[in-house]
């Protein structure tokens, strides 16, 4: 459920099916992954806080029973920490039954946040981050223009868990293709094991 007139398609994880979708950004700041068509038609932009506040206010008036909010689009953690804290607080203030806020977060965006920033976001009520590992094989990550490395992904995942977040990771099983199936499977398992 959402109240929004912004351009582009809305995407969310399956587990956020009954969440209020709050599009704090439009599109994806990276948006070069060859396997992902989700935000190709949207030019990335961060919405002004006043606009986001208005969406939260309209959403709370229309859906006062909301228990979960999902901050969209492709990588909400690209926002300044103080802006995210404001958004999370406003959600908890206006949705009295709210139990959890979640967001997509790229490994790079998680890694850019300090441990203190991540802890503050979690303490404010951001409970789950959805991140795309895709592959643990650097050759595959380079080929698909993911914009990260296995090392950075491990570091980001460890930082998120240390801050107290639940971490939901996406892995694309066939991304290695026939030529890198073994390396893709092996290195992806290593990354997941190293994170947790």
Stretches with model-predicted labels:
Residues 9-51:
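Canonical Radical SAM [4Fe-4S] cluster-binding loop centered on the CxxxCxxC motif
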Residues 28, 36, 52, 71, ...:
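Conserved, mostly hydrophobic/aromatic
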Residues 43-49, 104-111, 176-183:
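Active-site mouth loops of central-metabolism enzymes
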Residues 1-17, 95, 190-194:
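Auxiliary Fe-S-binding modules of radical SAM enzymes
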Residues 52-56, 112-120, 183-191:
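Short, acidic/polar
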């Amino acid at each position: 459920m959402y109240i929004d007139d912004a351009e582009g398609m809305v995407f969310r994880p399956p587990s956020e099916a009954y969440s209020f979708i709050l599009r704090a950004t439009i599109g994806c700041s990276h948006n070069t992954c060859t396997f992902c068509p989700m935000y190709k038609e949207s030019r990335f932009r961060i919405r002004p806080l006043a606009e986001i506040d208005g969406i939260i206010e309209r959403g709370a008036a229309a859906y006062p029973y909301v228990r979960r909010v999902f901050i969209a689009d492709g990588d909400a953690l690209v926002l300044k920490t103080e802006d995210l804290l404001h958004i999370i607080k406003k959600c908890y203030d206006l949705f009295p039954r709210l139990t959890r806020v979640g967001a997509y977060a790229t490994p790079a965006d998680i890694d850019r946040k300090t441990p203190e920033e991540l802890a503050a976001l979690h303490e404010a009520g951001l409970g789950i981050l959805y991140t795309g590992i895709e592959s643990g094989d650097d050759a595959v990550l380079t080929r698909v223009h993911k914009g990260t490395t296995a090392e950075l992904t491990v570091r980001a995942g460890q930082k998120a868990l240390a801050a107290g977040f639940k971490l939901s990771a996406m892995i694309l099983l066939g991304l290695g293709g026939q030529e890198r199936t073994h390396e893709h499977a092996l290195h992806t398992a290593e990354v997941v094991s190293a994170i947790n």
